[in-house]
């Protein structure tokens, strides 16, 4: 069993070797959501030790999908405020059907990068769906992205075809019935 300092030394060695080889490095803090909830001092120890290294992005995953919009905002804001010069990405899992809401909270907290998947495909209950996140960024947060919205539906249908995972007709943004309505 290694000490936290030994883990940091291992990471430092790999990051510096990658830099020598001109390889860009991102750090994925596996199970960050549980770490920041139950062992924030450990999370801070790791980031404090690595923050001066040539790391492009620190990935903050909700690996088990345990966060909600309230604590997503709280924990992401904590990271952004404590480390204003670092670039953080948020990676949501959808175990409680909160991935998109958690992404919304992460962006409001100052997170600059968001991980999504087409149609929300991913392990267990999936990840934040690109189509929904794009709509939230534009319509709820009033922000623009460089994504070409007109291509989303085609990409979603292509992924549906090749993955064999069908898009529910009532799926927000991309479901075939989402823009229909019935009146009494």
Where are these regions (language model features)?
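Glycine-rich phosphate-binding active-site loops on the catalytic face of alpha/beta enzymes
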Residues: 109-126
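Alpha/beta enzyme core
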Residues: 1-88, 103-111
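A mid-to-C-terminal "edge-of-domain" accessory segment
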Residues: 142-184
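Gly/Ser/Thr-rich beta-alpha loop segments that engage phosphate groups in nucleotides
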Residues: 67, 122-124, 128, 166, ...
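Short glycine/serine/threonine-rich phosphate/pyrophosphate-binding segments
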Residues: 96-101
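Generic beta-strand/beta-sheet core signal
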Residues: 28-30, 61, 89-93, 114-119, ...
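C-terminal helical cap(s) of enzyme catalytic domains, especially alpha/beta-barrels
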Residues: 122-149
